[in-house]
Amino acid sequence: MSHNTFGHLFRVTTFGESHGVAIGCVVDGCPPMLPLTAEEIQRDLDRRRPGQSRFTTQRQEPDAVKILSGVMPHPGTGEQVTTGAPIGLLIENTDQRSKDYSDIKDKFRPGHADFTYEAKYGIRDYRGGGRSSARETAMRVAAGAIARKVVSGMRVRGALVQMGPHKIDRDKWDWDEIARNPFFCPDKDKAAFFESYLDGIRKSGSSIGAVIEVVADGVPAGLGAPIYAKLDGDLAAALMSINAVKGVEIGAGFGAAALTGEENADEMRSSSSDMGNHGPVFTSNHAGGILGGISTGQPIVARFAVKPTSSILSPRKTVDRNGAETDIFTRGRHDPCVGIRAVPVGEAMVACVLADHVLRHRGQVGAS
């Protein structure tokens, strides 16, 4: 199985399965002399960790990360810093229940990657989905914590802005509210609604989808490249690679199709400071901070749609490996809305793409 690596200069390779001994990643290309501790990575992992509320899977994984390589004490200060060597990270799996999946080892679960993995490789890991499980995304979050070190002047934040058909009130957006509720929701009133709404979904044994928005502030103008190395193209690919994601948009996205040219084009005004260093002032941001594949200096805004968790309690019709029709009953522990824990994953992927483009920009034009 190839294609377990993404990035060009800031490269992340993940490995491990949902019910294997451990999951891990190797981050290659991280610059040296950046302060980095396991505790800093752990803070990001704890935001994604399962079992923290009744609204996520009850699989109890501490997700305790170990740094295996790529760091050492600074020769002068003693502070742990990166060395420029590949950074190896490992998380041991501790709460697998593979027996929950024994009844479906020969059946294809609707909405899952069971059939497609079998069709491609002739074998699949039915125990929690193997590589196709969202368990893999823990290592993306760990890599994202390192990426944030590379782009320390930028701030990457995500929020759940829609659950099912219910959208937040953008006039009530409060970034501080995200840490106060289990949904990463910036709208206090809608977070209270989501609690009762998702309780009903959860108790019925069903699931629901969500839309996540990630905003990156402090991104300088000039990151990215034309045609085949567009910043928005890489962001879209990175976000689409997340489990259960079925759509990505940048800025106005699909909404731009309903706008006129006058409405969509972000007008510019002269800034009071040196244009060469700071650029113009934009009167809107329908472009989502990217034009021609290159950042404008405005906040980068990306949204992605997460489908409902395919593992639900109601019986479904399917076929087995022999092509015979059969019923399937899903057991195990699953998220009623996998979009909740996708928020820190989306942040991590955006941070990794930005780190990669910072290093590529530095290599091409010599700028820091």
UniProtKB/Swiss-Prot annotation:
It catalyses: 5-O-(1-carboxyvinyl)-3-phosphoshikimate = chorismate + phosphate. Its cofactor is FMNH2. Keywords: Amino-acid biosynthesis, Aromatic amino acid biosynthesis, FAD, Flavoprotein, FMN, Lyase, NADP. Its EC number is 4.2.3.5. Reduced FMN (FMNH(2)). SUPFAM superfamilies: Chorismate synthase, AroC (SSF103263). GO terms for biological process: amino acid biosynthetic process; aromatic amino acid family biosynthetic process; chorismate biosynthetic process. FMN binds at R131, S132, S133, N243, A244, G292, K307, P308, T309, S310, S311, R333. One of its GO terms (cellular component) is cytosol. It is an enzyme of class 4 (lyase). Gene3D superfamilies: Chorismate synthase AroC. Pathway: Metabolic intermediate biosynthesis; chorismate biosynthesis; chorismate from D-erythrose 4-phosphate and phosphoenolpyruvate: step 7/7. GO terms for molecular function: chorismate synthase activity; FMN binding. NADP(+) binds at R48, R54. This reaction introduces a second double bond into the aromatic ring system. Homotetramer. HAMAP family: Chorismate_synth (MF_00300). Belongs to the chorismate synthase family. This is Chorismate synthase. It comes from Nitrobacter winogradskyi (strain ATCC 25391 / DSM 10237 / CIP 104748 / NCIMB 11846 / Nb-255). The gene is aroC.
